[in-house]
Amino acid sequence: ATAEEAAAYLDGKLDGKTIGIGGSVTIREMGLDQRLEKHNQVLWHWKHGTLQDAASTQVYLTSVNGLAETGELINIDGTGNRVASTIFGHEEVYFIVGVNKLAPDYDKALWRARNVASPKNAQRLGKQTPCAVKADKCYDCKSPERICRALTVLWEAPKGIGRSEVVLIDQELGF
C-alpha cells in the first residue's frame, strides 16, 4: 500500500475511538494523526501532557525500528512508553511500517534498529551521544542522553493486547 492508501485504510477502520500515538516520524510524515483527529480522540506522544494518557487508550499506533522478513518486530525506546504500549493495555495496536525498515532476518533487523534508526532519532532529538554526533552507528554508549534504554522483540501479539496488525507501506518513511 502507499502511505495515502494506508492512511485511508486506518481512517476508515478507526472511528469514535481513543487513540494513542507513540513517537513516530512515519506517522507524522503521513499526516495520519491529523486525519484521525477529525473523528477520534487522538493523544499524540509529542504533545505535552499526553504521555500517560496515550498509554490508556483503546487503540495505539506506532512504527518499528526494524521489521524482519522472518516476522520479528523490533523497537528501541528511551522512555519505555512506546514499547510498553505495544505489549500491554490496548484493544488494538497498529504498527505502521515503511519498506525501508524491512530486513531479511532478526539479526539484520536488530542491526538496523541500533545502527540506522537509533542514531537518526538521537540526532532528531538533539542528543549529544556518540551515535548522534558521528551519525554512523551505535556505540553502545553510557551517556545520560542515551535513547537506547529498552529493546522489545515481538514474535506475535502479546496476550495483553486484543489484536495487533502490521500495516506495510511500499514507501520509505521514518527512520
Residue ranges, per PLM feature:
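N-terminal active-site beta-alpha-beta segment that forms phosphate/nucleotide-binding
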Residues: 1-61
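Conserved phosphate- and dinucleotide-binding cores of soluble alpha/beta proteins
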Residues: 55-175
